[in-house]
Amino acid sequence: MAIDLKKHKSRRIILTKQGKRTERHIPVLLQPVLAGLIPLVGAKVIDGTFGAGGYTRALLNAGAQVIALDRDPHAIREGQSLVDEFFPRLRLVQGNFSQLDCVVEEKVDAVILDIGVSSMQLDEAERGFSFQKDGPLDMRMAQTGFTAADVVNRLKSDELARIFKILGEERYARRIARMIEKRRCVQPFLRTGDLAHAIEVLVGRKSGERIHPATRVFQALRIYVNDEIGELARGLFAAERVLKPGGRLGVVSFHSLEDRMVKRFFSARSGESVRSRYLPEIEMAPATFFPLFKGGITANKEELERNPRSRSARLRIGVRTEAECLFADMKLFGLAKIASFEGGKK
């Protein structure tokens, strides 16, 4: 079935409660997502990362029934108008997508996961996700638990360095961690702009350099605060449990660490052996997925021009087989261990 994407694109301009015009979130790789999950008419789909509702709206416009989850209470509040608009085909649930198998009573036709921070969260300075706008050093998606400020002001430098190195793939992880530990003794880091500036002064920035030197540190802190790696791993296993045979799992990731996890999952679940320096070779098991589009799908030139945030996005899709679910072993991903925040509390 062909999809007329002009009908299903999210509207770009909306009115806020104050009557001001604002731009609606543009979901990345929307066309490949819709094409990869078809047929959608009457399909039961889980959108595990509702965010600003871009994918959910497009899925609903294509005729699907959607259960959408998000751990961010702000996203849930903002999404109520969409629930009213598409009642009864949309159910909105506050919760982590790692628990998506707890919100459905029967198998579903598709699951879509858009990993990482949403544009809505990035654009709100008070949420503290971005250094583009100064705000409190927060970064909590669910708005509960410890903040990024707690992490940088309490963890030892070697623990910080490990977080920056593993979760942010930051080459200057140790230097930055030592600087943070030394500086916070005089004045704690409480603002995004303060931390970003301190990193820029330490590392330096060449004229015309596109990527800010604090980018990878902010990425690492956000991933750590929200346990995004654990969430992704558990979410992949949960999707395996809820998809019916022939059902499709689509995952959009934005950096190499997440993409490697998704790739390893589909490789292992398709019957391929997986190698890692962290664990012995995993024996082949009955395939529960077969992946589509080897190497994944990235944004084309047109989308890159329209939505620069799609630059680093990659979509991977797997089709569920009839095989029984396999054991949910976190070792499959070959991840190095990082200390929990409990050791950093006063």
Curated annotation (Swiss-Prot):
This is Ribosomal RNA small subunit methyltransferase H. GO terms for cellular component: cytoplasm. InterPro entries: RsmH, SAM-dep_MeTrfase_MraW_recog, SAM-dependent_MTases_sf. The lineage of its organism: Bacteria, Pseudomonadati, Pseudomonadota, Alphaproteobacteria, Hyphomicrobiales. GO terms for biological process: rRNA base methylation. It is found in: Cytoplasm. Specifically methylates the N4 position of cytidine in position 1402 (C1402) of 16S rRNA. Its main location: cytoplasm. SUPFAM superfamilies: Putative methyltransferase TM0872, insert domain (SSF81799), S-adenosyl-L-methionine-dependent methyltransferases (SSF53335). Belongs to the methyltransferase superfamily. RsmH family. Its EC number is 2.1.1.199. Keywords: Cytoplasm, Methyltransferase, rRNA processing, S-adenosyl-L-methionine, Transferase. The gene is rsmH. GO terms for molecular function: rRNA (cytosine-N4-)-methyltransferase activity. It catalyses: cytidine(1402) in 16S rRNA + S-adenosyl-L-methionine = N(4)-methylcytidine(1402) in 16S rRNA + S-adenosyl-L-homocysteine + H(+). HAMAP family: 16SrRNA_methyltr_H (MF_01007). S-adenosyl-L-methionine binds at G53, G54, Y55, D70, F97, D114, Q121. It comes from Bartonella henselae (strain ATCC 49882 / DSM 28221 / CCUG 30454 / Houston 1) (Rochalimaea henselae).
